Amino acid sequence: MTLNLCVLTPNRIVWDSKVKEIILSTNSGQIGILPNHAPIATAVDIGILRIRLNDQWLTMALMGGFARIGNNEITVLVNDAEKGSDIEPQEAQQTLEIAEANLRKAEGKRQIIEANLALRRARTRVEAINVTS
């Protein structure tokens, strides 16, 4: 039995195919979704989406949004998403270093909040490359 997974951003469809299982980062922690999962709607946190196709696991960096699960259909609507295999490791590492430097230099609540958010996004992209299952 499989699930139909569709990952959408405002500009494109990132993923639309059948999967065996996913592990999704939500605002209340990670949840595993298998076929015949109970229907839910949940907020998606900045984090890694793990996708199992047969015996292979793939990763995707998600930048926050919402997910709806029901009737073996999973729809994930996010601000942005990148497949781990599409992320350039050197560029992701440079972005992480810049985000860390910007956080150290941040002054005032707004700059600190924005710098923390950029750092979380950068860490998620690096993690999507480095995750092995």
From Swiss-Prot:
Gene3D superfamilies: 6.10.140.480, F0F1 ATP synthase delta/epsilon subunit, N-terminal. It comes from the Eukaryota. Keywords: ATP synthesis, CF(1), Chloroplast, Hydrogen ion transport, Ion transport, Membrane, Plastid, Thylakoid, Transport. One of its GO terms (biological process) is proton motive force-driven ATP synthesis. CDD domains: F1-ATPase_delta. It is found in: Plastid, Chloroplast thylakoid membrane. It holds the Pfam family ATP-synt_DE_N. Its main location: plastid. SUPFAM superfamilies: Epsilon subunit of F1F0-ATP synthase N-terminal domain. Belongs to the ATPase epsilon chain family. Produces ATP from ADP in the presence of a proton gradient across the membrane. This is ATP synthase epsilon chain, chloroplastic. It comes from Vitis vinifera. The lineage of its organism: Eukaryota, Viridiplantae, Streptophyta, Embryophyta, Tracheophyta. The gene is atpE.
